[in-house]
């Protein structure tokens, strides 16, 4: 993609300032709750109080907030005022607070730099989310589409960091973009893979439900063309981003030795959900949701699938079903 072709239509001074102010309000209220900052209460009228907090460089934050349950707060974005004894702050408002705290709390430059990246990614997503639908419109949406209207984790301030995505990946794969995708499939040799399921569900059962006879025949034909036997492999869906950024770079030896074989795309289309790695089938809602490992960092964790939890999942499912059926 040439830089002149980059979709930048959502970015303008007004939308950026609005997203910044909303994120700054969230940062202030969450940092108050966590006692990261301890602002002085100037006055209170009913449920609304005015607060002031000053960092070590003389940047002062004055704002209004409502006390909520469990010692939490709700800061009014439009009430926030920043003043500086030295000069007008030169950074965007959310980044200004991060810099203030990084210096006040002795945060390392590498940590501060990483957080700045997460906050900027979050701001970009927040700008894209500004033209959300009305409550009436949301009420008529099914949950697969509704997740594309959500703003992320309600308490974590850098809740859409998605470290690993470039802007092109964001436009293609972020849930708020509501871009349907098709899943790619690979064949993985049974000597390096294992299949785990409920006792009543076999691998062939899953494949026959999730893939059409036409697709299964095409996959077998692809393996046969390379003098490989379909019976020696498991078919596994993969995300395109994971394939390009993780599987090929880290498992090239397996690919070279036919232990991993790319097969192509499935026919069905999917919507990504808030977790990034979970997908809902929009072609056939009777089919399973699909959760795929994606090695991006979002809301404090990498979105992989830890093997020990994945392997034990069928047993947990069986146990919960047993409780339900009592």
Label every model-predicted segment.
Residues 2-326:
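Nucleotide/phosphate-binding site architecture used for ATP/NTP-dependent chemistry
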């Amino acid at each position: 993609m040439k830089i002149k072709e980059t979709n930048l239509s959502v970015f303008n001074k007004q939308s950026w300032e609005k997203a910044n102010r909303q994120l700054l309000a969230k940062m202030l209220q969450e940092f108050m709750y966590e006692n990261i900052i301890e602002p002085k209460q100037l006055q209170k009228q009913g449920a609304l109080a005015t607060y002031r907090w000053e960092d070590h460089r003389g940047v002062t934050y004055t704002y209004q907030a409502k006390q909520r349950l469990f010692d939490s707060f709700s800061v009014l974005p439009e009430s926030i005022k920043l003043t500086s004894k030295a000069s007008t702050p030169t950074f965007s408002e959310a980044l200004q607070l991060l810099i203030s705290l990084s210096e006040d709390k002795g945060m390392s430059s590498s940590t501060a730099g990483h957080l700045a990246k997460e906050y900027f990614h979050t701001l970009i997503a927040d700008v894209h989310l500004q033209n959300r639908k009305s409550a009436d419109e949301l009420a008529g949406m099914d949950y697969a589409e509704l997740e594309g209207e959500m703003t992320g984790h309600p308490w974590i301030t850098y809740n859409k960091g998605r470290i690993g995505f470039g802007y092109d990946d964001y436009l293609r794969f972020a849930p708020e973009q509501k871009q349907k995708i098709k899943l790619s499939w690979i064949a993985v040799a049974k000597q390096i893979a294992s299949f785990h399921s409920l006792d009543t569900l076999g691998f062939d059962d899953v494949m026959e439900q999730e893939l059409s006879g036409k697709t299964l025949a095409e996959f077998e034909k692809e393996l046969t063309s390379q003098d490989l036997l379909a019976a020696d492999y498991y078919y596994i869906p993969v995300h395109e981003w994971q394939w390009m950024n993780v599987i090929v770079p880290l498992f090239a030896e397996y690919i070279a030795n036919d232990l991993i074989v790319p097969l192509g795309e499935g026919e069905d289309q999917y919507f990504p959900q808030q977790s990034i790695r979970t997908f809902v089938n929009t072609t056939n809602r009777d089919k399973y949701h699909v959760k795929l490992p994606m090695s991006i960092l979002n809301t404090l964790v990498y979105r992989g699938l830890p093997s020990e939890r994945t392997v034990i999942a069928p047993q947990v499912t069986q146990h919960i079903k047993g409780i339900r059926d009592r």
